[in-house]
Amino acid sequence: MTNSIQLLEESIADKIKNYQKHLNYWEFNDKHVDIWIKQFPEEEREIVLTETDSLLSHNYIKKSKIKEFFEEIWDTKEIMGTNPIMSLNQIQFLNIQIKGHSQKRLVNLLEEYYLKSKGITINRCNHMNVKKYIYLDDCMYTGLTLMKDINNWIDNMSPNCDTQLDVIFLGEYNGNCDYVEGCLIKKCQEKGITVKIYRMYEYNNNLHYALPYDVLWPQYMDDDEYVNAYVQYMEEQKTITGKGGLGFRNPYLGEESDLFTSSYNRVIFEKALLKKGAYICSLPQNRNERMKPMGYSHGISLGFGAFFATCFNISNNCPLAFWWGDLRSSSSETLGKWYPLLPREVN
């Protein structure tokens, strides 16, 4: 092992050492990182580690960053008014997520933080005198979860009419944002509820916006058996469904996304993740149709390509090589054929 590899492994391990500490079942140290990286070809390892370390520096959300997020909410007059303590008497924090634990966890943390730091409790269930509802979550990817939750809330939970809904995310991928906001506004109009969306971090994956993109989206490659097989599968799906798809990105020579250390490294990194993701896609006998090398996604594509993780969990919209697999499974089992860096807690 070279000194640079060891330093990178230690740097990554230091960032993720408290990952899923609430589950208390694994030690995320430099040995853990070393096992993960050795699944990649030796010539790719230093770049994969370098770019992974960079992604974690930007988009791995520790508890301290979550507390900063709560303070930003408190200090934002458009959300909390000029007197947050008084405003809280008319605010309800929603816990309406149909699938997953991220909203409940965040609201619990916010309640605990405001009680300790502000000496005040929040309203989580009482509609009386409520003039504003707050929908809190860690990150918006496609927005489908948000839309399902709000549709169900409007249809079945009798929110107060003529109020306001503030949707607040730690992070937001903007590719579907305009469509989602339009759907929310239309649905909430049934109750006279106005909608505003806030985010702490915004990531560009909107094909109509200027480059660069803040997602992992590989350029073309044709020298890997698993990638070739997956691309062939994509072409077959296009023929069967009569639908188009989103394939490889075009080369880009402009200023690079801050998430990556260089354009050169980014290209190699994305291809490395694609190759391992395509291999992982080949493992299950009955693969979920949303399972794609660069992360779960609807439609015909290489995958969503997000990278956003908290100290509690990582999204399945991230490339499979980061999270797919089971640390406790043997190599003879399907889930034991890949060792994840950030194993995912399934919703």
Label the model's feature ranges.
Residues 92, 132-134, 166:
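Structural motif
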Residues 109, 149-152, 183:
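Alpha-helical scaffold elements adjacent to nucleotide-binding pockets in ATP/GTP-utilizing enzyme cores
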Residues 109-118:
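Short helix-loop-beta junction
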Residues 119-130:
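Short acidic low-complexity segments
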